[in-house]
């Protein structure tokens, strides 16, 4: 669904810190920190993951999954145009 690296990249594109992402998503700061520290796909309960993805989408972030159109063919993020 989303990786820790995608979370960090999305925050960088938005110019926000972990605390601000926690506020936007309705999740706790420790939850955001734990999710971002994941080496691969973030593990968590479905509700938390959905809150995170919805908050990023509302801010204009598009998640790029493996195998979709990107320069590298790997996961990433971009701002919707």
Describe each region flagged by the PLM.
Residues 7-20, 81:
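Short basic helix-loop element that most often maps to the first helix and adjoining turn
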Residues 46-63:
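DNA major-groove recognition helix of helix-turn-helix/homeodomain DNA-binding modules
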Residues 27-44:
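Recognition helix of helix-turn-helix/homeodomain-like DNA-binding domains
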Residues 24, 45, 69:
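Residue-level "edge-of-site" marker
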Residues 10, 24, 35:
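Residues in the recognition helix of alpha-helical DNA-binding motifs
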Residues 6, 31-34, 76:
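Residue-level recognition of specific faces of alpha-helices
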Residues 61-81:
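Helix-turn-helix/homeodomain-like alpha-helical modules used for DNA recognition
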Residues 1-12, 53:
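A short, Lys/Arg-rich alpha-helix, primarily the initiator
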């Amino acid at each position: 669904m989303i990786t820790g690296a995608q979370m960090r990249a999305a925050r960088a594109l938005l110019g926000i810190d972990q605390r601000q992402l926690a506020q936007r998503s309705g999740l706790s700061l420790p939850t955001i920190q734990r999710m971002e520290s994941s080496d691969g796909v973030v593990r968590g309960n479905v509700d938390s993951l959905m809150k995170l993805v919805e908050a990023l989408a509302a801010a204009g972030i598009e998640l790029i999954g493996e195998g979709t159109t990107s320069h590298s063919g790997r996961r990433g993020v971009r701002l919707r145009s």
